[in-house]
Amino acid sequence: MGYIHDQDGILKRYFREAVGWEQHLRNSSEFILKCLKNKNVKELIILGSGWLLDFPLEKLSGEIEHIKLVDIFHPVQIQKKVKNYPGVECISADITGGNIEMFYNQVQICKKLNIPFTFPDHTRSPEGIFPENSFVISLNILNQLDILVIDYLKRKIPLGENTIRQIRERLQKDHMELLKTVPYILITDYEELLINRDGWPDTIKNLLYADFLESNYTKDWSWHFDAHGLYN
């Protein structure tokens, strides 16, 4: 579905937008450290670990016995890097909880039978996905879950706006249901503010299709994502 290309794009954007990204990455790492302070975490699971730009691996690897970095694909550089950290491992897995395979199979069925795409039934329970006594971090991934799935579906089948919204809702709500089963930290974009060429706020776009879970500690910050105006 284009995962490797997408991760390469993230790193290229980071190098291009380093000034605007650094504060966001620092905020993410500091938020994680504050939330984990004085918690006796034995196993930490990171969903959407990617390039580890926003995760304080060096510090936490010395404090937590087991750290599992979970993503659909791990860059070779990251696979080599974690070999220097005992107790840290890369796990390749579908962080949507099986939805990627489900949508892929549904497309194949519709093409084989030459029938319109129908929204697949979903019966998978979130219980038992994570090991007992694990602590989970959803790391800047919630509003990204649908991007590659929808891009793939658009290349294969006609896709209406209502179906796109349904997919986004399902992926985000399923993700939140997964988090309900364990202690967790959620870091996510929830709103996109577009700035016009004169430097004034132009459009606000909601990025979430699922309700936040109750939390004891929250923090908001702005991420200057695209100062060069190349994002679309």
Predicted feature residues:
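Class I SAM-dependent methyltransferase Rossmann-like catalytic core
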Residues: M1-V41
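Conserved class I S-adenosyl-L-methionine
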Residues: N40-L52
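Conserved SAM-binding loop of SAM-dependent methyltransferases across substrates and taxa
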Residues: G50-I64
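Conserved SAM-binding motif I beta-strand of class I
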Residues: H66-D71, S92
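S-adenosyl-L-methionine
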Residues: K83-F130
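A short SAM/SAH-binding and catalytic strip from SAM-dependent methyltransferases
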Residues: I115-E127, P131-K154
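Conserved beta-strand signature within the Rossmann-like core of class I S-adenosyl-L-methionine
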Residues: I137-S138, G160-Q172, L178, V182-D189
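Charged, low-complexity C-terminal accessory regions
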Residues: Y190-N232
